[in-house]
């Protein structure tokens, strides 16, 4: 006796899938404003500030453009040593998932898949700029998503309280 669990059309539900159709550099900028002085050895490590953002936009019914933006700046005191900005995108096909799973997929799973490639591009850019490669620590996209949802909830509550008091 066999059990047929595969979808064969005729109304059978398709298994959920997440596919990367394309990956691309949307924007890359490296600035070394103090070169060549900025390349000299220093007594202490520079301070590094990193900002991360994720955006997702629909392209078609099941296709989405997800862009992971990484901005990193190294400073020695008040002097900027380098500034690197990367917008790294991926086109994802998402099908068979319940609607309530779409935002977490687009803002957690998709950037998690893009991150290793974006990290390598940033490391190569800083190395090619004359600095040691900047190896960005892994990012907790689930925590970022939770924070973003909490901020949007607060904004919505403030907007609702402003409309009810006017």
Curated annotation (Swiss-Prot):
InterPro entries: SecB (IPR003708), SecB-like_sf (IPR035958). It comes from the Bacteria. It is found in: Cytoplasm. Its main location: cytoplasm. One of its GO terms (cellular component) is cytoplasm. Keywords: Chaperone, Cytoplasm, Protein transport, Translocation, Transport. One of its GO terms (biological process) is protein folding. One of the proteins required for the normal export of preproteins out of the cell cytoplasm. It is a molecular chaperone that binds to a subset of precursor proteins, maintaining them in a translocation-competent state. It also specifically binds to its receptor SecA. HAMAP family: SecB (MF_00821). Belongs to the SecB family. Homotetramer, a dimer of dimers. One homotetramer interacts with 1 SecA dimer. This is Protein-export protein SecB. It comes from Sinorhizobium fredii (strain NBRC 101917 / NGR234). The lineage of its organism: Bacteria, Pseudomonadati, Pseudomonadota, Alphaproteobacteria, Hyphomicrobiales.
């Amino acid at each position: 006796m066999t059990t047929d669990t595969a979808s064969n059309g005729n109304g059978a539900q398709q298994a959920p899938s997440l596919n990367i159709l394309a990956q691309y550099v949307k924007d890359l900028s490296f600035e070394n404003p103090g070169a060549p002085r900025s390349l000299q050895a220093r007594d202490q490590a520079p301070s590094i500030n990193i900002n991360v953002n994720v955006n997702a936009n629909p392209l078609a019914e099941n296709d989405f453009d997800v862009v992971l933006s990484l901005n990193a700046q190294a400073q020695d005191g008040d002097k900027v040593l380098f500034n690197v900005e990367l917008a790294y995108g991926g086109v994802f096909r998402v099908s068979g998932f319940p609607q309530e799973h779409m935002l977490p997929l687009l803002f957690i799973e998709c950037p998690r898949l893009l991150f290793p490639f974006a990290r390598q591009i940033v490391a190569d850019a800083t190395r090619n700029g004359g600095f040691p490669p900047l190896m960005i620590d892994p990012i907790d996209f689930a925590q970022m998503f939770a924070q973003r949802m909490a901020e949007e909830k607060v904004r919505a509550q403030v907007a609702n309280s402003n409309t009810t008091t006017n």
